[in-house]
Amino acid sequence: MTPEKLAHIAGILFDKDGTLLLYDESWGPVNREAARIASAGDAELEPQLLFSGGMDPVSGHTRPDSLLAAGNAAEIAAGFVAAGSPIAVAELTRLLDDLFIRSAEFSVPVTDLAALFGKLKARGFKLGIASSDNEQAIRLTAIRFGIIDHVDFIAGYDSGHGVKPGPGMVLGFCRATGLDPAEVAMVGDNNHDMHMGASAGVGLKVAVLTGTGSRETLSASADICLADITALMDLLPEKLHA
């Protein structure tokens, strides 16, 4: 990666869970509640659903790029039904979306998001959030952590831009900000994020290690792996646009 490549970056599109938020702390309890809802009172089914979604019901570890790590509510619902949930996919999707909206109140940030976004905005960067969560939950999270006024674009799986790993959310960010994909850094914690960035032709794919992915699972698809999003301050150059 060359300084020239970094110098062309003018916008940063962030994934939410595992990127802005610590994944295990924020989503471990939510995943267990999702399985409880989907089991419809069958206590023996709950751990089976968790395992089918990629979470070890004993250790709480969630596999990188698994359904629970990277899927949206509709995909998780379909997976749970395939694994034995007696609830119809459409109804379970609605129940999971409602759960994810409520859960925004309990999410745990990686850092002081308002301070970080304020510094990046002061440098002139356009900022966006693209998540497999629903848009309402993303907005509630952005409001809760004081970054809503710093964000130029928000997209969830239900926002009309398509779903990951397709390019739609990145291209929507570009339309909203007037940037070319080559001017965008995609930042995320799993390969869905990196593949979305690649499919849209972003200038930089940044993986962070605060989610379910590891350096081993992400290094092939990312341009660089960072410990967390705070390292962006040193990675990206000062940009003082008017």
Segments (PLM) and residue ranges:
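Asp-based, Mg2+/Mn2+-dependent phosphohydrolase catalytic module
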Residues: 1-10, 25, 40, 118-121, ...
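N-terminal helical cap/lid subdomain that shapes the substrate entry/recognition surface
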Residues: 6-114, 123
